[in-house]
Design a protein with these regions (language model features):
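Membrane-interfacial loop-to-transmembrane alpha-helix junctions, especially the N-terminal start
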Residues: 1, 120-123, 192-195, 199, ...
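Membrane-helix boundary/interfacial segments in multi-pass membrane proteins
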Residues: 17, 23-37, 154-168, 254-287, ...
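Membrane-interface transmembrane helices that cradle and orient dolichyl/undecaprenyl
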Residues: 172-195, 300-302
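Hydrophobic/aromatic-rich transmembrane helices and adjacent perimembrane loops
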Residues: 215-217, 325-353
Length: 393
């Protein structure tokens, strides 16, 4: 798949540039997206390689505190590195490549499952991977006015471009999330023992990697399953929702207990994860072209995308709940929005004349990709200058 090769190249290009062109004496370390987080993952890998258990401590705090179950992927990588006598960073780099590949494959399967046609699926894939919002024109407008304006937060909940540069647990979580949605949110989902076991494995993996958004997705599965059951479209989704909830609880409950009842971990990671969602009107800046197309295409969405719409609505509600990590609750919603937008774009283009349809597609591509291209250039430039760009710091 050409897109898979392109994403692999983009993900590795900053590392290649830093290896050949960074300032003399500097070495590449960590990730180029949310670079401040990598020290915690490195510490978890080191602790995993030095101990038999899976609990970790916060090595960056002198305060006395208990151990916690955190960052299991990186603890596991550290253990494998110790057993194989290879550097943990090498395994982490290989995990990055694998995670990005799995994410792109899962995204394509997701787009094919819910898009109205193969051409709409291709549009959805490109919008999900490279589509941004109106950040660039908004920034230009603010410069003209001479005042600071909101120009987007570029978090991976609202822009999947960052998943091509993020630490491996995030694209892995996105891959398992999209695969779970693909298997469970469509009508007529089969409820075979093997299928339910796969569902349980996917939701357990997602809960271990990125637990914040799991309740919204499982809740969407439950609501959609009830509708499908009551309208005679099978019980597969409802059974999958029950299994998913049971599989998620053993992971989610200890996580909630640790960060709600333990004073140290609660204070440490509440302060670190202050992640407010954009105000509703600011979503136009973050996902403008896709949001406008999706609103246009809601009435054109077929019955097969009903589950997708319910998940989007629940994610939209969840991301404004009064919790510190608001926008984490909408993880996975951007690809869903891209599919609805792509369906609308293809449907509208089909009823326009050839020239108008081409102009519409070109306009959407320019509007959606302009900000992503600018940030991508910034990422690559920072690899040469050894200076992380604040937009993705």
């Amino acid at each position: 798949m050409p897109v898979l090769a392109l994403t692999f190249l983009l993900g590795e290009l900053p590392l290649l540039l830093s290896a050949c062109c960074a300032p003399q004496g500097a070495t590449g370390l960590g990730t180029v997206w949310f670079v401040n987080d990598f020290a915690q993952y490195e510490a978890a890998m080191r602790q995993g390689s030095e101990q038999q258990g899976w609990l970790v401590r916060d090595v960056f705090s002198p305060e006395p505190h208990g151990l916690a179950f955190m960052f299991p992927l990186y603890v596991g990588l550290g253990k494998v590195a110790a057993l194989a006598h290879v550097p943990a960073e090498l395994l982490e780099r290989l995990a990055e490549v694998l995670a990005r590949g799995l994410f792109v494959v899962a995204l394509w399967r997701f787009c094919r499952a819910f898009a109205s046609s193969r051409s709409a699926a291709r549009v959805a894939l490109l919008l999900a991977l490279f589509g941004g919002g109106f950040e660039l024109p908004t920034a230009a407008f603010g410069a003209v006015l001479g005042r600071a304006v909101y120009v987007g937060n570029w978090s991976y909940e609202l822009n999947s471009l960052g998943l091509l540069f993020a630490a491996p647990h995030v694209p892995l979580a996105a891959a398992s999330t999209l695969e779970l949605a693909t298997r469970s949110l469509r009508p007529g989902a089969a409820a075979t023992p093997r299928g339910l076991m796969v569902t349980a494995g996917l939701v357990a993996a997602t809960s271990l990697l990125h637990p914040f958004h799991v309740p919204a997705l499982v809740g969407a599965m439950g609501l959609v399953g009830l509708v499908y059951w009551r309208t005679g479209r099978g019980t597969g989704t409802l059974l999958a929702a029950v299994v998913a909830g049971l599989a998620a609880l053993p992971v989610l409950l200890p996580t909630v207990a640790t960060f709600s009842l333990d004073a140290f971990w609660g204070a440490t990671y509440t302060a670190q994860n202050l992640l407010p969602s954009p105000l509703p009107h600011e979503l136009l800046v973050d996902v403008g072209p896709m949001l406008l197309l999706a609103l246009l295409g809601l009435r054109r969405t077929g019955a097969g995308a009903f589950g997708l719409i319910i998940w989007l609505l629940l994610a939209l509600i969840a991301m404004y709940l009064p919790v510190p990590y608001q926008r984490r609750l909408a993880f996975g919603a951007q690809p869903a929005l891209a599919v609805v937008a792509a369906n609308a774009l293809v449907a509208v283009a089909a009823v326009l004349g050839r020239r108008r349809a081409a102009a519409l597609r070109l306009g959407v591509a320019a509007a959606a990709a302009s900000s992503s291209l600018l940030v991508l250039v910034g990422v690559l430039a920072s690899s040469v200058r050894n200076a992380p760009v604040p937009v993705y710091r």
